[in-house]
Design a protein with these regions (language model features):
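Detector for Asparagine
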Residues: 20-23, 27, 48, 70, ...
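N-terminal regulatory/sensing modules of transcriptional regulators
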Residues: 1-27
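Generic surface-pattern signal
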Residues: 10, 41, 45, 60, ...
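C-terminal output/effector regions of signal-responsive regulators
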Residues: 29-95, 99-103
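A general structural signal for well-ordered secondary-structure junctions
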Residues: 11-14, 46, 68, 108
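A generic alpha-helix structural signal
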Residues: 2-5, 59, 95, 136
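C-terminal engagement/docking regions of AAA+ P-loop ATPases
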Residues: 73, 82-84, 93-96, 100-144
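Serine/threonine-rich low-complexity intrinsically disordered regions
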Residues: 7-10, 20-21, 32-34, 65, ...
Length: 144
């Protein structure tokens, strides 16, 4: 069960949905678009990059259906492309470029906090799927 709420005052899109746990308790997860944007900017991904908006859209879709993390190429990129009037190849490339810029010029402390890794500079940026999964689970675990 999910629904979008668009508040009139600040025009923030808020996604609210319910997850049924094994014990049949209902947990409500609230992910705000502004929270996603703020986290990406803290990492160091510039908001003016096309990949930035694709990552935001991708994380919104993953919040609706975490199974997207198992179908990045043939599911997530295709659906992001549809929502953004683009192609799956452009979505993949722009997300990859935004991640690379973020890891090249971004805030290492923030990157280490989310990715639990101290030397991405040696390894380069994570793959798109690893990045999206790590950011998604960070947001879920920290209720952002």
């Amino acid at each position: 069960l999910f629904r979008f709420i668009d508040t009139m005052e600040d025009h923030q899109k808020v996604l609210i949905f319910t997850i049924n746990s094994e014990n049949d308790f209902k947990n409500v997860l609230r992910i705000e678009t502004s929270g996603i944007q703020k986290l990406l900017m803290q990492i160091g991904i510039p908001a003016n990059m096309l990949g930035f908006s694709y990552i935001v859209t991708a994380l919104e879709l993953i919040a609706l259906d975490p199974d997207y993390l198992n179908h990045i190429t043939k599911g997530l990129y295709v659906d992001v492309a549809k929502k953004c009037s683009s192609t799956a190849a452009r979505v993949e490339r722009n997300i990859r470029h935004a991640i690379e810029i973020g890891f090249l010029k971004g805030d290492l402390e923030e990157i280490e906090k989310i990715f639990h890794c101290s030397s991405y500079s040696d390894k380069g940026a994570p793959t798109n799927s690893k990045f999206l999964a790590e950011v998604y689970y960070y947001m879920v675990n920290n209720e952002l």
